[in-house]
Regions:
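N-terminal signal peptide c-region/cleavage motif recognized by signal peptidases
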Residues: 15-17
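Charge-biased low-complexity segments
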Residues: 19-147
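Sec-dependent signal peptide recognition
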Residues: 2-8
Length: 147
C-alpha cells in the first residue's frame, strides 16, 4: 500500500515537473503620459520599460494604474498618488514603487530649477508565448479606458 502511494506521488511529481518548467511568463509595462502630453520640463533619465513586478507575474495580475505626482527641483518623484488602479489596488502600490526609483532630468538648462506636476498611466501586461505577444497586448490595452 505504501509503495503504491509513493509510486503515485513520484509519477505525479515527475509528470508535473515538465509542465512547471515549460510555463513561461513574459511581462511588459507600458508608460503613457496623460498630463502634460507635450512640452515636458522633465524627462526620465532611463526610458526603458520598467520591469514587470515578479509578484504580479506570479499571480497573473494584469491591468493599469493612473498615477499623479510632482517632479521636484532635484528630479525626484514626490507626492505620489494613485488616481486609479484596475483591477486591484496592488497595481497602484507597485506603480508607486516604480516611480520612486526613476530619476528625472531637465529637458533644458532653463528648466533645471522648476518643478512639474505629472499624470501617467502604467499598463501591466503578460503573455505566455513571447515578449512581443505581451508588448502587443499592452499596446492594445493602452487604448482602453483605465477604470
Amino acid at each position: 500500500m505504501k509503495c503504491s502511494i509513493l509510486s503515485a506521488l513520484v509519477i505525479f511529481a515527475v509528470s508535473n515537473s515538465g509542465f512547471a518548467k515549460s510555463l513561461n511568463v513574459y511581462g511588459d509595462v507600458q508608460v503613457t503620459d496623460i498630463q502634460p502630453t507635450s512640452s515636458f520640463i522633465w524627462e526620465r533619465e532611463n526610458k526603458k520599460s520598467p520591469l514587470y513586478p515578479i509578484e504580479l507575474a506570479r499571480s497573473g495580475i494584469v491591468g493599469c494604474a493612473v498615477m499623479s505626482f510632482d517632479i521636484s527641483e532635484s528630479g525626484k518623484a514626490e507626492n505620489i498618488e494613485v488616481v486609479k488602479s484596475v483591477p486591484q489596488k496592488s497595481l497602484g502600490k507597485y506603480s508607486s514603487q516604480i516611480l520612486k526609483k526613476w530619476n528625472w532630468i531637465p529637458t533644458s538648462a532653463t528648466n533645471a530649477m522648476t518643478s512639474e506636476k505629472r499624470t501617467i498611466r502604467l499598463d501591466f501586461c503578460i503573455g505566455d508565448e513571447s515578449t512581443e505577444q505581451s508588448q502587443n497586448a499592452c499596446k492594445q490595452q493602452t487604448q482602453l479606458v483605465c477604470g
